[in-house]
C-alpha cells in the first residue's frame, strides 16, 4: 500500500514538473513573439518614414530630368555654338551625375547604395527579410565609353545578363530595381531554409532544397491530431523567382482520415501566407498548447 502511494506521489510530481516545463516554454515563446511584433511595428514606422524621404528624392530627380531635357532641347534648336555648346554639354553631364547620385541616394533607402568611381559607379545591393539583414552583392557599372557591368558578385543562377540586356542601357533605375527584387527574394528564401534547419530534429526532419535558387523546399514535420502523433511531408513551391513566400504548399500523410486532411488543409494556407519559420512556430505552439490542455485534463482525472 505504501509503495503504491509512493508511486502515486512520484507520478503526480512528475506530472506537475511536465506542466511547469510546458508553461515555461510557452511563456518564453509568447515573450519572444511579443518582442518580434514590437520590432515589426517599429520597422513599419521606419518604412513609412523612408518612403516619405524616397518620394522627396523622386521629386528631386524629376526636376533634374526636366532640366536635362531643357538643355537637350536648346542643343537641338541650335541655340548654343562653339564654347557655349561645350559649356552646355558639361552642364548636362553634371546634371546626369546629379541625377545618378540622387537615384543612388533614393535606392539606399530601400537596400541599394553606391559610390562614384573613375569609370562609373560601384553599387551595393543589401538584402533583408523580416528585419534581418542578409547578404550583400556588389556591381561595378562602367559609364564610359558605354554603360556596362565590369565586375560583380551576383550568383550565377540570377539572370543578371538578361536583366542587364533588357534595362541597363535604357533605364538604370529599372535595372537596379529588378535586380534587387531577384536578389532580395532569393536571400529571403535562403534565410527561411536556414531557419528551417534550426528547428529540433524531433519536430522537423529531412529538410532539403530542390535547387540553388531555393524555389523548392521539402521537409517532414511531426504533429498531433486527436492526441495521436503523425508525420507530415511538405513540399513548398515558389512560382516566381521574385517571391519570398510560396505559391503552393503540397502536404501529404499516409493516413487519410478526415481530421488529418483538415489539419493538412489549414497548414497549406499557413505556409503560403507566412514566412516558413513563422508558420512552423505557430504549428509547434499549437501542438504544445494541445499537449498542455491534455496534460491538465489528465491531472484533473488523477486527483
Swiss-Prot record:
Coiled-coil region(s): 38-77
Compartment(s): Nucleus; Chromosome, Centromere
Gene Ontology annotations of biological process type: centromere complex assembly
Pfam family, one: CENP-O
The keyword ATP-binding is annotated on this UniProt entry: no
Keywords in alphabetical order: Centromere, Chromosome, Coiled coil, Nucleus
Transmembrane segments: none
GO cellular component: kinetochore; nucleus
InterPro entries: CENP-O
Span of the signal peptide: none
Keyword Coiled coil annotated: yes
Biological function: Probable component of a centromeric complex involved in assembly of kinetochore proteins, mitotic progression and chromosome segregation.
Family of the protein in this entry: Belongs to the CENP-O/MCM21 family.
Protein name: Centromere protein O
Source species: Xenopus tropicalis (Western clawed frog)
Amino acid at each position: 500500500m505504501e509503495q503504491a502511494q509512493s508511486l502515486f506521489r512520484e507520478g503526480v510530481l512528475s506530472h506537475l514538473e511536465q506542466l511547469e516545463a510546458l508553461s515555461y516554454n510557452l511563456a518564453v515563446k509568447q515573450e519572444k513573439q511579443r518582442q518580434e511584433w514590437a520590432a515589426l511595428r517599429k520597422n513599419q514606422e521606419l518604412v513609412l518614414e523612408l518612403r516619405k524621404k524616397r518620394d522627396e528624392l523622386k521629386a528631386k530627380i524629376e526636376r533634374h530630368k526636366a532640366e536635362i531635357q531643357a538643355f537637350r532641347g536648346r542643343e537641338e534648336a541650335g541655340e548654343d555654338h562653339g564654347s557655349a555648346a561645350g559649356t552646355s554639354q558639361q552642364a548636362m553631364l553634371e546634371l546626369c551625375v546629379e541625377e545618378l547620385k540622387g537615384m543612388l541616394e533614393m535606392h539606399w533607402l530601400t537596400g541599394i547604395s553606391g559610390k562614384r568611381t573613375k569609370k562609373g559607379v560601384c553599387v551595393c545591393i543589401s538584402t533583408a527579410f523580416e528585419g534581418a539583414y542578409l547578404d550583400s552583392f556588389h556591381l561595378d557599372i562602367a559609364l564610359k565609353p558605354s554603360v556596362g557591368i565590369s565586375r560583380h558578385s551576383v550568383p550565377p543562377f540570377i539572370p543578371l545578363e538578361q536583366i542587364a540586356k533588357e534595362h541597363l542601357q535604357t533605364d538604370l533605375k529599372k535595372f537596379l530595381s529588378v535586380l534587387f527584387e531577384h536578389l532580395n527574394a532569393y536571400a529571403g528564401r535562403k534565410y527561411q531554409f536556414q531557419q528551417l534547419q534550426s528547428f529540433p530534429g524531433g519536430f522537423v526532419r529531412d529538410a532539403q532544397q530542390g535547387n540553388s535558387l531555393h524555389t523548392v523546399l521539402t521537409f517532414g514535420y511531426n504533429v498531433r491530431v486527436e492526441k495521436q502523433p503523425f508525420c507530415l511531408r511538405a513540399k513548398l513551391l515558389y512560382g516566381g523567382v521574385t517571391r519570398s513566400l510560396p505559391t503552393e504548399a503540397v502536404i501529404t500523410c499516409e493516413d487519410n482520415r478526415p481530421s488529418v486532411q483538415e489539419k493538412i488543409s489549414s497548414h497549406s494556407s499557413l505556409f503560403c501566407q507566412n514566412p516558413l519559420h513563422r508558420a512552423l512556430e505557430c504549428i509547434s505552439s499549437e501542438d504544445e498548447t494541445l499537449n498542455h490542455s491534455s496534460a491538465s485534463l489528465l491531472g484533473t482525472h488523477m486527483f
